[in-house]
């Protein structure tokens, strides 16, 4: 994948970059795998904002992506590599030998015409899905399950990957993109390879309007608010907030740990790097 730059025809265009979409092979998605997406504006069923800075954005359809990879021992041919507006990664349309069609996350170097397989005895090549017990140590993997049969939940963003570090008892130790080393059951499925679209992190948004196209609303600073709205609000003229940085609800921010101990904490062998 390449990054496309623009001539500085305006202030917003000057630093803007965009994907060249070289790997995309079709512009129209598979209609049988589309769902309508309803916008929430970050509101819950009471109409109250539960997720700030969400709203607007381009209308889009949801693509049903197969994270489970539960069609075991049935080969599938890659029919196309497509754009998905709901995620940073590209998706690949698979045509299975029994006639079914499904989308999967497109790994790096997966091409149209390739054959992929989900099996305990599949080859170790990008796009193939296997249980962790059947994958050699040191292999680069993505789309990793945390619960058997639930579907992949880890390492799904563009360019991300995890690495299988060790196997001990009924658990495998997997190094995640954050640097965390975590124990995962050996019977959980994972897909071989790195998620594609690796240059996604190098894209520059360039202007505020492009963030709005993505459904992201502006983030207002606390010091620019009134005292009723934020602990940093108020004061005559410009102020620094007058206290250590806090959230709108008074919880310290900038490094303060808010994660509570939970049952799954015992599966973390090494915490994520700072």
Curated annotation (Swiss-Prot):
Q: Name one GO molecular function term.
A: rRNA binding
| Keywords, alphabetical | Ribonucleoprotein, Ribosomal protein, RNA-binding, rRNA-binding
For the keyword RNA-binding, the answer is yes
Query: Taxonomically, which superkingdom?
Result: Bacteria
Q: Name one GO cellular component term.
A: large ribosomal subunit
Region (Disordered) residue ranges read: 223-255
Quaternary assembly: Part of the 50S ribosomal subunit. Forms a bridge to the 30S subunit in the 70S ribosome.
Give the protein's recorded name. Answer: Large ribosomal subunit protein uL2
Species in which this protein is naturally found: Geobacter metallireducens (strain ATCC 53774 / DSM 7210 / GS-15)
Q: Which gene encodes it?
A: rplB
């Amino acid at each position: 994948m390449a990054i496309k730059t623009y001539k500085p025809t305006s202030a917003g265009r000057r630093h803007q970059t965009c994907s060249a979409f070289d790997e995309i092979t079709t512009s129209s998605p598979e209609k049988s795998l589309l769902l309508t997406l309803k916008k929430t504006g970050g509101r819950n069923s009471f109409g109250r904002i539960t997720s700030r800075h969400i709203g607007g954005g381009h209308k889009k359809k949801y693509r049903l992506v197969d994270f489970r990879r539960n069609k075991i021992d049935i080969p599938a041919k890659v029919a196309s590599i497509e754009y998905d507006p709901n995620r940073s990664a590209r998706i690949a349309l698979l045509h299975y030998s029994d006639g079914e069609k499904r989308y999967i996350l497109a790994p790096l170097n997966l091409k149209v015409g390739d054959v992929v397989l989900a099996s305990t005895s599949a080859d170790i090549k990008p796009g193939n899905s296997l249980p962790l017990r059947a994958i050699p140590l040191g292999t680069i993997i993505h789309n990793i399950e945390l619960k058997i049969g639930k579907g992949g939940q880890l390492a799904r963003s563009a360019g991300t990957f995890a690495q299988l570090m060790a196997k001990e008892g009924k658990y495998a130790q997997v190094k995640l993109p954050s640097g965390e080393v975590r124990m995962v059951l050996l019977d959980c499925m994972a897909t071989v390879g790195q998620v594609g679209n690796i240059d996604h992190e190098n894209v520059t948004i360039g202007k505020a309007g492009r963030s709005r196209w993505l459904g992201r609303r502006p983030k207002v600073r606390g010091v620019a608010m009134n005292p009723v709205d934020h602990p940093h609000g108020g004061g005559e003229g410009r102020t620094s907030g007058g206290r250590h940085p806090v959230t709108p609800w008074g919880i310290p921010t900038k490094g303060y740990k808010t994660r509570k101990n939970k049952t799954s904490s015992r599966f973390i062998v090494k915490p994520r790097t700072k």
